[in-house]
Amino acid sequence: TPVCHLSFFEADAYARWAGHRLPTEFEWEHAATQHRSRTHLASGTAEKPASLPKSSPSHESSQSISGNFLETGNLHPIPATSREGLQQLFGDVWEWTASPYTGYPGYTPLPGALGEYNGKFMSSQVVLRGGSCVTPATHIRPTYRNFFPPATRWQFSGLRLAKDAPKES
């Protein structure tokens, strides 16, 4: 079962203790968009996790996103049943990244609009990715960003570990 109810600082400390790190927001997004198989987060029951219909506005790159979403009635994290590929990217817990919540590279707000990013309010927030078991499936996509204060524990926050690839000699 995924670890949840962690602050960013706790997630980062654990990752370092384990000899890993938290992924950056862009590493997380790259992994999520490149992972084609979208393995289901099986609950060990006959229930099939929800997935987004291809006509959904959140459906990207003709990929199906599956997970334990609000619509399944699974309102707690459920462990994956197989070890193939990336698991549980969507629908269990929001995963802390190592990235501050800032505008995307090249982002410029329209004149007079606060837009997605308001530097004054967002300057101390950290990005979470993936969605939780209480996030509606229609909100989930590999590019969806969430944010939270780094010192705050949240019942729907967790972590994913990353490790640098070995350097070629």
Model-flagged regions — what are they?
Residues 129, 136, 142-150, 157-159:
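Extended alpha-helical regions
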